[in-house]
Design a protein with these regions (language model features):
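Helix-turn-helix-type domain boundary/helix-start signal
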Residues: 69-70, 265
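H/E-rich (His + Asp/Glu) clusters that bind or coordinate divalent metals
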Residues: 10-13, 17, 91, 96-100, ...
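Short hydrophobic/aromatic-enriched beta-strand-loop microsegments
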Residues: 56-63, 164-167, 187-192
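An N-terminally biased module of ancient metal coordination in phosphate/nucleic-acid-related enzymes
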Residues: 1-59, 70-71, 75-80, 85-163, ...
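Histidine- and acidic-residue-rich, metal-dependent catalytic cores
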Residues: 66
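Residue-level detector of alpha-helix boundaries and kinks
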Residues: 33, 115, 137, 166, ...
Length: 280
């Protein structure tokens, strides 16, 4: 059994709640050592903090996601600082930029019902404030970026960054930007959803990323692998998409080892070193 590390997931999200006991047992049986569980708004911070006290494999991470940037409170940044100071293990995230939520999502999509969508400029303000806080406290930052890679690179260049580095979770940016992001301190997490044929170009990126910057993630309960790769089916969620069991992290390890032409054991040693260097 190899040690497993999940660099980005959401164990606190509702679709996983009825399955927590089973998931916990499955993860312990698989050999999961740590998983970074990312809160996405102020209401979730105490929930993730409480779960981290209950489950010893959870590494808590707190932030305001770009989808939630338009709904933050007046004292959100002070609250985030307090949350991070209360737990020296805690990372910053999920934070970032998302142009699709501004320009691409359908107005009646239930995921945005009742929330205010922040324009990209406002998202950038919220992101840079959190990145600067991560730099001040030297906490890892877990970054979400959709259709805004040029803007993200520009912000990372001009904003203080944590000395330990930051994670571009589920990296989907251009291959030609990898060198620039790496020079700024980036790590990159491989997601099991990349097994889908439509993601072939993103798979190639993970051949080129330096070995000492590789991590793996599930993003559970979202981004389930294709059915033929889904080792732990949990059925459909409220939106009829498959619920992704965090145990599918082993599938990500197997896929990435094959993609890079290394043994599972060699990959696990490298990923463990990378995870501990970034997060702990």
């Amino acid at each position: 059994m190899i040690p497993l590390y999940d660099a980005h997931q959401h164990f606190h999200f509702d679709p996983l709640t009825p399955h927590r006991t089973v998931i916990d047992a499955d993860l312990r049986r698989l050999g999961l050592k740590r998983a970074a569980v990312n809160a996405t708004n102020e209401e979730e911070w105490p929930v993730v903090a409480a779960l981290a006290r209950e489950y010893d494999w959870i590494l808590p991470s707190h932030g305001v996601h770009p989808w939630d940037s338009g709904n933050r409170s007046a004292g959100w940044l002070a609250g985030l600082r307090s949350q991070l100071i209360a737990d020296p293990r805690a990372a910053v995230g999920e934070i970032g930029l998302d142009r699709w939520i501004v320009d691409g999502i359908k107005p009646r999509d239930p995921r945005i019902a009742g929330i205010r969508i922040a324009p990209l400029a406002e998202q950038a303000e919220v992101f840079t404030a959190q990145l600067a806080l991560a730099a001040e406290l030297n906490r890892a930052a877990s970054i979400h970026c959709v259709q805004a890679w040029g803007a993200m690179l520009g912000l990372l260049k001009k904003t203080a960054r944590p000395a330990r580095g930051f994670l571009l979770h589920g990296y989907a940016g251009p291959a030609e930007m990898i060198r620039s992001f790496t020079g700024l301190g980036a790590y990159y997490s491989f997601n099991v959803q990349l097994a889908e044929p439509r993601h072939a170009s993103r798979l190639e990126n993970f051949r080129a990323i330096p070995a000492d910057r590789l991590l793996l993630e599930t993003d559970a309960p979202t981004k389930a692998p294709p059915a033929e790769h889904n080792r732990f089916p949990l059925g459909p969620g409220p939106d009829d998409t498959p619920i992704n069991h965090p145990g599918n992290i082993i599938v990500a390890y197997e896929m990435l080892a094959e993609l890079r032409g290394v043994t599972l054991e060699a990959l696990s040693v490298q990923v463990e070193n990378n995870f501990l260097r970034l997060f702990l």
